[in-house]
């Protein structure tokens, strides 16, 4: 555990009263977290759309490779977008990057909806990925730099809540639009819907201000005070305190830079500043651990998990997905309501521990399914209509039961409808979901042989619903802290000069590991089984728990300028506190002189 003495970055006690929130803060927060909604919606809606796009006119044929590319290209481009947004937000401001992201969200959604071929659809998914990367990096930074200290954690947690809400809405709209000519119109409406909230966000940010910390950093002192007046609802005591904090931090940082002859790229300065490098490493690892806990395996492969329970109807699959996404939506209310009361660390550790248990539960559920699934018959009983020279035939024969068989794309289980015994056969070339390419479930005679049934995705067992229940428990426990805390902490960890770059690096870490987990899950299940894959994620989450326990500090109650000191050693912290007290004394002296001078002039005017 990280223990840190309480201190004030400005060397002065904070105002004793809690500032009252005005309408401005609520509008600012609501407009900002639309970025989280779009993040969740656009990463999830493709799951429902993919049930229809492979057979849509203009998009056929769409093989497995194309489907994987269309799904994974957005997370891949999000990593690029998050890196781009770090530098650009330093130069043009946080607000303009959010405006740019909103515009790209709108264009990407409309391009996807209007696609007449796979290339056009791919371009749209690339644009959406870049916009997701922008939003996932810049919205937490914007909220962290603008929100009052006592609600900062709650508002950044609201960003994570809106990611989950976007996923719920994606499944609901997917279900609703699936009834409107889904192969021609429905899937297009699923993508087009996202243009509505992105346009709303764009319009809102035309009138919302830049963050006060970016404004002061770039020489707009008057505008900084004006924004703080709105944020703190005209509370002069809090406005003066925050203004002194910002000025003191910037002047103190300027002295340090001059003393150290700081120059060159920000990334080089980060590498040469041990406590900032430490914070960036911890922040990046938290984002990596979020993905290593397997969250997007569940979110991206929800339909596969549901189908493994025996659900074959696409509409039913989508509506069950809605129920699971609701579990993911309920959880974030826990950190939103408790984060400013009990702190970040306790919620994070609690959620992390429950995630370990739920991952073990999922693994046990899949293990029970595996052990209860029908065994394959020995090779000498495959019959004369089985041709072992067919592609994948010998490989399929090697699987010992139905569960191992249907886990592999190339195979399916052909079983006697009465005895449940059967064969693992290669899937058919034209209709792999309906027939095998050889053996008793082939369509060589126009239909499958009497009493035989072909299963491509699931096995008949008494445990088939258990994985769905386990996934619901997992989503509930994961979203109760693991979803939001990496975003909250990364919005707080870094000094102003390094914030956008460090958040960009940590966000890129999230997207890179997102892509790695998404691309390796199916391969993992074929090597160590579905249960083995989730137990591996459980082991990685145990490491995350230990990492959080010993390396992540509590940031509750500290101003965003104070949090930087939590990563310093004791000597550095004492020096920083002393230096900042001296700076704030000078700042307050100047501020008081300015006020007195203004009052003196006013007396003589009248």
Swiss-Prot record:
Pfam families: Sugar_tr. One of its GO terms (cellular component) is apical plasma membrane. GO terms for molecular function: myo-inositol:proton symporter activity. InterPro entries: MFS_dom, MFS_sugar_transport-like, MFS_trans_sf, Myo-inositol_Transporter, Sugar/inositol_transpt, Sugar_transporter_CS. It catalyses: myo-inositol(out) + H(+)(out) = myo-inositol(in) + H(+)(in). Residues 1-20, 85-96, 140-152, 210-278, 339-345, 486-501, 553-606 are cytoplasmic. Coiled coil: none annotated. Induction: Induced by hyperosmotic stress. SUPFAM superfamilies: MFS general substrate transporter (SSF103473). It is found in: Cell membrane. Disulfide bonds: none annotated. It comes from the Eukaryota. Glycans are attached at residues 314, 387, 445. Residues 42-63, 118, 174-188, 300-317, 367-464, 523-531 are extracellular. One of its GO terms (biological process) is myo-inositol transport. Expressed in the intestine. Belongs to the major facilitator superfamily. Sugar transporter (TC 2.A.1.1) family. PANTHER family: PROTON MYO-INOSITOL COTRANSPORTER (PTHR48020), PROTON MYO-INOSITOL COTRANSPORTER HMIT-1.1 (PTHR48020:SF10). H(+)-myo-inositol cotransporter. Probably by promoting the transport of myo-inositol regulates intracellular osmosis in response to hyperosmotic stress. This is Proton myo-inositol cotransporter hmit-1.1. It comes from Caenorhabditis elegans. The lineage of its organism: Eukaryota, Metazoa, Ecdysozoa, Nematoda, Chromadorea. The gene is hmit-1.1.
């Amino acid at each position: 555990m990280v223990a840190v003495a309480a201190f004030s970055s400005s060397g002065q006690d904070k105002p004793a009263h809690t500032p009252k929130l005005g309408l401005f803060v609520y509008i600012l927060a609501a407009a900002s977290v639309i970025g989280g909604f779009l993040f969740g919606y656009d990463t999830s809606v493709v799951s429902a759309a993919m049930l229809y796009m492979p057979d849509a006119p203009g998009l056929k044929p769409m093989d497995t490779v194309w489907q994987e590319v269309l799904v994974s290209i957005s997370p891949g481009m999000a990593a690029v977008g998050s890196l781009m947004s770090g530098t650009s937000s330093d130069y043009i401001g946080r607000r303009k990057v959010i405006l740019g992201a909103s515009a790209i969200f709108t264009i990407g959604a409309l391009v996807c909806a209007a696609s007449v071929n796979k290339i056009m659809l791919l371009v749209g998914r690339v644009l959406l990925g870049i916009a997701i990367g922008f939003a996932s990096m810049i919205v937490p930074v914007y909220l962290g730099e603008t929100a009052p200290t006592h609600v900062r954690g709650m508002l950044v947690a609201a960003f994570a809540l809106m990611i989950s809400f976007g996923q719920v809405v994606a499944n609901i709209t997917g279900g609703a639009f699936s009834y409107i000519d889904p192969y021609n119109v429905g899937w297009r409406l699923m993508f087009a819907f996202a243009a509505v909230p992105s346009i709303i966000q764009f319009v809102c940010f035309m009138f919302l201000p830049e963050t006060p910390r970016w404004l002061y950093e770039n020489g707009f002192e008057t505008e900084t005070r004006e924004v703080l007046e709105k944020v703190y609802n005209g509370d002069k005591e809090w406005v003066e305190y925050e203004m002194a904090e910002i000025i003191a931090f910037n002047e103190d940082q300027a002295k340090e830079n001059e003393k150290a002859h700081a120059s060159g790229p920000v990334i080089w300065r980060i590498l040469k500043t041990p406590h900032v490098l430490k914070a960036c490493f911890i922040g990046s690892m938290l984002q990596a651990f979020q993905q290593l806990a397997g969250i997007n395996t569940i979110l991206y492969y929800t339909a596969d998990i549901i189908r493994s329970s025996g659900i074959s109807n696409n509409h039913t699959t989508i509506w069950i997905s809605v129920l699971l996404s609701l579990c993911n939506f309920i959880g974030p209310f826990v950190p939103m309501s408790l984060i400013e009361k009990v702190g970040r660390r306790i919620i994070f550790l609690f959620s992390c521990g429950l995630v370990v248990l739920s991952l073990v539960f999922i693994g046990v559920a899949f293990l029970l399914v595996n052990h209860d699934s029908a065994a394959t018959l020995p090779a000498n009983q495959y019959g004369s209509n089985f041709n072992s020279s067919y592609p994948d035939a010998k490989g399929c024969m090697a699987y010992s039961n139905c569960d191992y068989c249907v886990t592999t794309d190339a195979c399916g289980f052909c079983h006697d409808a009465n005895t449940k015994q059967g064969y693992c056969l290669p899937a058919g070339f034209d209709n792999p979901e309906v027939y095998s390419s050889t053996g008793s479930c082939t369509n060589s005679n126009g239909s499958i042989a009497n009493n035989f049934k072909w299963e491509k995705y699931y096995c008949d067992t008494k445990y088939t619903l258990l994985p769905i229940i386990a996934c619901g428990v997992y989503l509930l426990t994961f979203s109760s802290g693991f979803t939001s805390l990496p975003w909250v902490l990364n919005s707080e960890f870094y000094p102003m000069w390094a914030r956008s770059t460090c958040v960009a690096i940590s966000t890129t870490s999230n997207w890179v590991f997102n892509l790695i987990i998404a691309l390796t899950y199916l391969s993992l299940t074929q090597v160590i089984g579905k249960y083995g894959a989730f137990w591996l994620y459980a082991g990685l989450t145990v490491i995350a728990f230990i990492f959080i326990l010993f390396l992540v500090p509590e940031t509750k109650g500290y101003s965003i300028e104070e949090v930087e000191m939590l990563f310093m050693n004791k000597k550095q912290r004492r020096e920083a506190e002393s230096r900042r007290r001296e700076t704030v004394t000078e700042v307050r002296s100047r501020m008081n002189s300015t006020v007195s001078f203004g009052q003196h002039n006013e007396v003589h005017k009248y």
